[in-house]
Amino acid sequence: MGIVGVGIDLVSIPDFAEQVDQPGTVFAETFTPGERRDASDKSSSAARHLAARWAAKEAVIKAWSGSRFAQRPVLPEDIHRDIEVVTDMWGRPRVRLTGAIAEYLADVTIHVSLTHEGDTAAAVAILEAP
């Protein structure tokens, strides 16, 4: 297997928190019910955890885009909702894909790491293919 894409994203948690629950925001339909439930179950701010998940979605998109260097981008409009960050019972993240992006990346393993420190959330995604 080899690395075919790397993506990273940083999110300002205070800025994100202001936007995430505003009526008409794109974020209302960006997160799956599971992502919203997981974030609300945490002891700290839900916005903090959703910001890290947003960063993960963006990192996956950047890694995928980078893997298509010199090729036309193929990004479905509702791509963020098709990238879901799930966690196991110990809080370790994994990416679950649905829709068109799942078809494009069917043979790709996605490694993801999320973090938040102070006012910043971040994520790194690495795409690995056979």
UniProtKB/Swiss-Prot annotation:
It is found in: Cytoplasm. SUPFAM superfamilies: 4'-phosphopantetheinyl transferase. Gene3D superfamilies: 4'-phosphopantetheinyl transferase domain. It catalyses: apo-[ACP] + CoA = holo-[ACP] + adenosine 3',5'-bisphosphate + H(+). Optimum pH is between 4.4 and 6.0. GO terms for cellular component: cytoplasm. Apo-AcpS adopts different conformations depending upon the pH conditions of the crystallization solution. This is Holo-[acyl-carrier-protein] synthase. The gene is acpS.
